[in-house]
Amino acid sequence: MSFRFNEAVFGDNSFNERVREKLSTALNSPSKKKLDILKSGIKVQKVDFPTIPQLEILDLDIITQPKSLAKGICKISCKDAMLRIQTVIESNLLLISEQDTPSFTMPQLINNGSFTIPITMTFSSIELEAITNIFVKNPGIGISFNDVDLDFKFDCSVKILQSTIERRLKESMHVVFKDVLPSLIFNTSQNWFTNRGESTSTIPGKREHHHQQTTMSRNVILDGSDFQELSPINMLRLSSIVSSRSTLSLHSTVMNSLSAIPGCLERQNLYRFISRMPSLNNYYSSQSFPQPKSSTVSSKQLVKPFYCSHNLLPKTVLDSSQYDLATITKIQSRLFDRSNSNDDNAKPRRRKIKCKKTRTPSNLQSQGEQAVDDSTAIETVTSTPVQTPIPELEEQSPPYLKTTVSIRDKYVIPEKISLNLDSKKDTSKKKPFYFIGLNSQEPSNNWKWGMEDSPPPYH
């Protein structure tokens, strides 16, 4: 199936005039933007199609559709078309936003008058190739452009603005083929096949149609039956989104949770998070301590928070000595486990305190005794308590020797010199000693304790 355009239609200037009028109406439609630099409307001066456009039908569906509807896919090719438009723009940008701007923000200039610039734009050598979907229903034709390949030459009367306007026009051409041309072709087909009165009565204009859509969208209200069709999961997500909008409020709407958004902490719930942290301050802040009575109370004491960010014991606890070492150790362990939960190899740095015992008179007396040549540790051991008297024998000759009798049944151990059994490392490496129940009182004799190979000397 093929179609052929009537050359007489394109040769007659009436077709170009109709296209020019429709294009002027489409370009002068009310803009959605508040700010507009156009001082006057857009005037289409000339439209020319020197060559007949080519139309190739790629697909046509008539059988499956109703009789009043025809659907097809076509390829449109147009060459050497020309378009010339003219308008006036406002170069003083301060006047554009003067109505919507407060007077105290506007600068006081000496001359703030209007400065208009007429501009003429010419599009020549227009080449267009597009794949379109055509819908023919009753006397109207609807066309939607899918794949568009457009090329043209642009000339502007203001040369300094030519490159900027050309770049912006090429970026906004999708709006022309999406909105302007389909509405222009549809209105032209209505006026072509039907009378003007019937077309206006049956089909509203673009502005009325847009107003109808906006009014209908504002009056849309969900009925009770519509909520039954909604998914409960979607309703739950919507309710969570609505509740999460209270992040900037001064008072939290959810009392038992730290945040309405998972993973986020709100500012008004920061004190709850800090109060739940294990620390010495938070643990002892709940206890009541006696406060000093004073006639004047400062404002800082009235608004003093009940939590602190540092991990220290309060001064009142130290003064009253109401702390427990086991509780402090437990809190510090919880803090370490919380901070090193991801690191299993981390070891706590514990502070070790060595408690040294005070020196007793017996220890001071043992330090004054003569040291043995061997490096084995020797300390003083008292076999009986101090209160129990030790039986002593009479002095024997020579007078500088003294014998001591031990309470032990098996061995006789001297009172002042004995083996330190706690030093296991030294006794394991050295040979064992054999002690005799004699004690030298004068260091001038130079007697030595004997080993197993050489027994001690006797006189």
Curated annotation (Swiss-Prot):
Residues 348-359 have a biased composition (Basic residues). InterPro entries: Mdm34 (IPR027536), SMP_LBD (IPR031468). It is a multi-pass membrane protein. Residues 1-190 form the SMP-LTD domain. One of its GO terms (biological process) is mitochondrion-endoplasmic reticulum membrane tethering. The keyword Transport applies. Ubiquitinated by a SCF (SKP1-CUL1-F-box protein) E3 ubiquitin-protein ligase complex containing the F-box protein MDM30. Ubiquitination is important for mitochondrial integrity. Keywords: Lipid transport, Lipid-binding, Membrane, Mitochondrion, Mitochondrion outer membrane, Transmembrane, Transmembrane beta strand, Transport, Ubl conjugation. It is found in: Mitochondrion outer membrane. Component of the ER-mitochondria encounter structure (ERMES) or MDM complex, composed of MMM1, MDM10, MDM12 and MDM34. Component of the ERMES/MDM complex, which serves as a molecular tether to connect the endoplasmic reticulum (ER) and mitochondria. Components of this complex are involved in the control of mitochondrial shape and protein biogenesis, and function in nonvesicular lipid trafficking between the ER and mitochondria. MDM34 is required for the interaction of the ER-resident membrane protein MMM1 and the outer mitochondrial membrane-resident beta-barrel protein MDM10. This is Mitochondrial distribution and morphology protein 34.
